[in-house]
């Protein structure tokens, strides 16, 4: 609920359709989404992040998918860059996008997560989400290109929220590794 408004505002003018998959939250997310054009709000039981994103991908009526989380937003320059793309090149199956992370509202300039390239725009006929529980990613067949613009990722409300996410993600990561036969001593 806290992030969805800015996320939707950043993408609604550069995509034909917005699919929001919600795992039956009880906040105002649905109400906020229904106030925006081209939004299809779908509820789906949460199993893991990859499964949730693949479900959304499967519901899309277009071949090209821009995958973005609620705590992310496109910069105006990235929005313009996406709108100008010619997406009919059969040799290109995906685009990597730069992502800058903000911490408590301030964009980081240094460190491992300050800026990273992530595959977020892809052709669903040539790509899918890998079967992992956390830190989902897209696997594609074909060539990819890099875009110049960037997404701003602002994932933490406060320190307590940050620590809660660490606990959640490490638990999911450990369960994923255990199910794959990787065990710790």
Question: For each of these PLM feature ranges, what is it?
Answer:
Residues 16, 30-59:
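Conserved donor nucleotide-binding strand/loop of the catalytic core
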Residues 1, 15, 23:
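Aromatic-flanked redox-active Cys/Sec active sites in thiol-based oxidoreductases
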Residues 50-57, 63-68, 75-185:
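Catalytic-site signature of metal-activated, phosphate-bearing donor transferases
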Residues 10, 22-31, 46, 69:
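A conserved acidic beta->alpha catalytic loop
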